Design a protein with these regions (language model features):
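Acidic, small-residue rich beta-repeat scaffolds with periodic aromatic anchors
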Residues: 1-13, 104-106, 111-218
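Acidic/hydrophobic-patterned starts of short beta strands in beta-sheet-rich repeat architectures
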Residues: 12-24, 81-93
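Short amphipathic beta-strand/extended segments with alternating polar/hydrophobic composition
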Residues: 47-64, 119-130
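Surface-exposed turn/loop modules enriched in turn-prone residues
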Residues: 29-58
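Short amphipathic beta-strand and strand-loop transition segments with alternating hydrophobic
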Residues: 6-10, 23-25, 74-80
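Short consensus segments that form the blades of beta-propeller domains
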Residues: 22-34, 64-69, 96-102
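A short, structured loop/turn motif at beta-sheet edges
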Residues: 77-87, 111-117
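Repeat-based blade/solenoid architectures
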Residues: 1-5, 60-76
Length: 218
């Protein structure tokens, strides 16, 4: 399915595991619309044939602008947070259908075995800041340090951006998936989310900031 963009093999208490990631952006249809998708699957390789543990598929259908669906390679992690030999597999990806430069939908998803899945869903930092020639500085709200509703609303008030929809760029909507999850899962996912957003924010800001002009040489 699509173009393979990642493959990972490891062993844990369940046996030998294979994780495959793929994505694709289609050519435009006759009417100019475009589609895109991401695909991921984890298989157990022990035995005569692979045993599918889970599959992920998400897409953008019939986008009249520019469609996109891409894995964030820094998001892929295999962990053993409980120390019981059972792996948690985390992947993250963005989706968009837009005609301008603006944040993408972003999902960070953790799978454990065949049936457990925990998600953080929000928007990333792509396009969240821009260079203001007159001010000679980057403009836009900074990356929130806390994605609670109160913290996001405080940032909106501070920057006098009342009416801004939540979540803010770089934040997720809620942590409801983790209500009954082991505490280390949410702690890891929170930290991982902000690490990814901080890196993206830094990379984006560097792209927007003009390079210093070289002194004229005589």
């Amino acid at each position: 399915r699509g173009k393979q963009v990642g493959a990972f093999v490891w062993s844990d208490k369940q046996g030998k595991n294979l994780l495959v990631l793929a994505e694709q952006v289609s050519e435009r249809d006759d009417d100019g619309a475009q589609s895109a998708f991401v695909y991921a699957a984890q298989d157990l390789l022990d035995g005569d044939r692979p045993k599918r543990l889970w599959m992920l598929y998400d897409d953008v259908q019939h986008c009249e602008f520019d469609a996109g669906a891409h894995f964030n390679s820094d998001a892929t992690r295999v962990t053993d947070l409980l120390g019981d030999g059972i792996s948690q597999v985390t992947v993250g990806y963005s989706r968009t259908c837009t005609s301008d430069v603006s944040p993408n939908d972003f999902k960070l998803i953790m799978h454990i075995g065949k049936s457990q899945k925990y998600r953080l869903r929000g928007i990333d930092r792509y396009g969240a800041s821009w260079w203001d020639e007159d001010a000679g500085a980057l403009q836009g709200m900074p990356l929130p340090k806390d994605c609670s509703i109160a913290a996001q609303q405080a940032l909106v008030s501070q920057y006098k951006e009342q009416g801004t929809e939540l979540p803010l760029p770089g934040c997720y909507g809620d942590e409801e998936d983790f209500a009954k999850a082991p505490k280390p899962y949410l702690e890891f996912m929170r930290q991982h989310w902000f690490t990814l957003m901080q890196k993206q924010d830094t990379d984006w800001s560097q792209q927007q900031t003009p390079a210093p002009a070289e002194d004229d040489q005589e």
